[in-house]
Structure formats: C-alpha cells, structure tokens
Amino acid sequence: MVTDIKQQHPDCKIDWLVEEAYAPLIKMHPAVHRVIPVAIRRWRRDFGQQGIWEEISQFSRSLRQNTYDIVLDSQGLIKSAVLSKISRGRTVGFAPGSSREWLAGISYAVKIQVSREMHMIDRCRKLAEKALGYRTNKERDYGLSTLTSKASASNTAMIFCGSAQRRKLWSVVHWIKVIRHVQQHGLEVEFTWGSQNDLDICQKIQAEAGGKILPKMELNELVSQLGETRLVIGVDTGLMHLAASLEVPLIAIFGASDPLKTGPLGHGPIQVCGSSTSFPDPEEVTRSATELLELG
C-alpha cells in the first residue's frame, strides 16, 4: 500500500503510526518519511502504573503537532480509529460492514466500502486506491526488495512456533516430528520468540528435538537473519508474512484463521498447510518441507 501511494504520488510525505515493536521494520521502507511508534500493548499491560497516563498524554500531544491531508486507517479497529481521531486530518477508513470492528467503521469522515472477501493485503491496497483516487495493477511490493533472501546458500531452517493467539498454536508433538524431519535433510534449526510464552514453547520443542534458540531480536535484526535462511516454517503471525515478503521459502501452518484472507503472499516459494477450520498433520508439513528443499 505504501509503495503504491508513493509511486502514484511521488511528492507526498507518508508518516506511519505503528506499534512500537514494529517500528524498526517500518523504518526500513524507503517510502516512509517518519515512523511514529505507539505503545498500546505496553500501556494495556502496565495500565495503572506510575507514569503511564503522562506518557499517553505526551504521545497525544505529539501526534497532534502535525496536520495531515489524509489520515488513512487500514486496520479498521476501534483502537486504530481512536488514534486516527486524535491525529489532525481528514480521517478515511473502511465503512461499517467493511471494517473489522463496526464501531470503527462509523467513526471516519470518509467511509470506503471494500469487500471483506478479499485478502487483507489487497483490501488495504484497494482502500488506498479509493481514498487517493488512483488505480494500480502492479504486483505487490513490500519495499524490501533489496533484502532478497540468500536462502540457497544456507543450511538453516527458522521456526516460528509462538503466537499471541493461543488458537493459532500448533501441537508441540507435531513440531518435534517436523523438526526432526528437517534435521534429517541436513538443516540446522533455529527458533525465534517474542514473549515468555513463545520462549516456553521453543524450550519444550528444543528439549526433545534439539536446535538453537536465538536471543530476542529487534525486527530489523530478524530481517537480516531471515535473509540468510534456507527454509521458514511458522504459524500465522506477522513474522510469517515478513518471511513471505523477503521471498524466503516458507511453509505456513493454519488451523484457526483463513489463509485465503490472511495467508502469506509473496514472490518466493510458499506452501500453505491447513485451513481455517483444521490444522495439518505433521506428515503434510514434512511433505511440503521436502518439496521446498528439493527446489533449491
């Protein structure tokens, strides 16, 4: 979406408001003028602690220092709609019925209908097209093309087994079988994690299957690591989409969300296992791993 906007309006300046953990990644996009970190998750976690309200007030004042021609909310959530309202500018977002949360949809000055049957990435692109009055048939461009994977020269498989949503987690027993299969193909396995729960899962799998648990990294550091990875296997998280954008060979495991609407999209080799209603068995994932490894 950001790449599209910059191509259509090369003189525009794009500021991106993003959860603070993702700020290092957004800074890597060449079309972004300024990254504005927000700490909604941390504020929720530490709500009531000393200094939080002052931090929120300072953030709100800072956000209102600039006036924008358009404030475009591509999330369609109540929290993102509130942040849009705090900003100075004409708010544009998904209309009720199109937005992920109905109350968000009624809050924007300009409400745009976009089919909920489209993939989420394409929905965001279409929202920007309608908001800014252009049409594009160009392929998706994540703005990370200069970081194309060196996967073929690597013997590392990276595992994304954690998720903030428990419903998206895959069985530890299944993970162990898949990791042993990958190791039999001569790959070294590395685990990444973002929370203590993620780390606990990694440690359970590692205790049975081995592998290396990487230290906690910023997203920009993880991008560098991913660019030299032969294979990624992961559940439905933002990290899975990051791997797809970097064209790393990817196996995406689904079971509680719809891959037709939120699945990985990229120009590299991708195998999707599972569906919106059922997780794959480990044999399906090992077959996919064999296919991708034989490609290169």
Where is each model-derived feature located?
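Catalytic machinery of carbohydrate-active enzymes
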Residues: 1-296
